[in-house]
Amino acid sequence: MVIRRLYQFCASHVVRNCSSLKCAQNIHGHNYEVEVFIETNRLDNANMALDFGLMQQEMQVFIESFDHAHHFWDKESLEFQRFIENHCVRYVKCSFNLSAESYALMFLYYLTKILQKSVFSNDEGELKVSSVRVHETKNGYAESFLKDLENPHFKSLVHDHCVSFSQGIQNLWHDKDFFNKIISDEKQCFFHAKPLHQIP
């Protein structure tokens, strides 16, 4: 059984080294759509794989951290990086080139960590993020799968510190340790209470 949740954010970037010069040589933006697919082996007490409302908490906070921000590769010139840091309140510094494929791998990596560190209380089954799709436009998307995180050609692109959020983004997190919890060694960080009203 698989469920899907759609998230959206708007952001700008440059995709260096690609054939499309408009993308490689210019700051430009997209209205991104991120589809997150979660797989389970059984349903919970509400006959759900996972309540969609729970997917509007930590997962949504993480994805919305990329909204209305400029994202840049840490291989950009120092002059360019300093310009962004000095003139943008919201920016994300990334250790990977900013293709849709890289975004898909990155979101899969961090959302998997969030789900693994989440404690649910409504008799949920074994949950995993089976894939993530990232759309830059309506015409195409990149999709990453769990097995991609074991592929040496892919997994070297993503790691605990492959993104760094500006202070302006962090200031809007209700939990100032939000990102540190995601990448910490703690196995349980995000707790979700059992629904109050239950029919036996």
Curated annotation (Swiss-Prot):
Active site: C23 (proton acceptor), H68 (charge relay system), E136 (charge relay system)
Binding positions for Zn(2+) per the UniProt entry: H13, H28, H30
Cofactor comment text: Binds 1 zinc ion per subunit.
InterPro entries: 6-PTP_synth/QueD, 6-PTP_synth/QueD_sf
Top-level taxon: Bacteria
Pathway: Purine metabolism; 7-cyano-7-deazaguanine biosynthesis
Enzyme Commission identifier(s): 4.1.2.50
GO terms, biological process: queuosine biosynthetic process
GO MF term list: 6-carboxytetrahydropterin synthase activity; metal ion binding
Cofactor: Zn(2+)
The entry's keywords: Lyase, Metal-binding, Queuosine biosynthesis, Zinc
Reactions this protein catalyses: 7,8-dihydroneopterin 3'-triphosphate + H2O = 6-carboxy-5,6,7,8-tetrahydropterin + triphosphate + acetaldehyde + 2 H(+)
Summary of the function given for this chain in its UniProt record: Catalyzes the conversion of 7,8-dihydroneopterin triphosphate (H2NTP) to 6-carboxy-5,6,7,8-tetrahydropterin (CPH4) and acetaldehyde.
Note: The active site is at the interface between 2 subunits. The proton acceptor Cys is on one subunit, and the charge relay system is on the other subunit.
Family: Belongs to the PTPS family. QueD subfamily.
Protein's recorded name: 6-carboxy-5,6,7,8-tetrahydropterin synthase
Highest classification ranks of the organism: Bacteria, Pseudomonadati, Campylobacterota, Epsilonproteobacteria, Campylobacterales
Gene (name only): queD
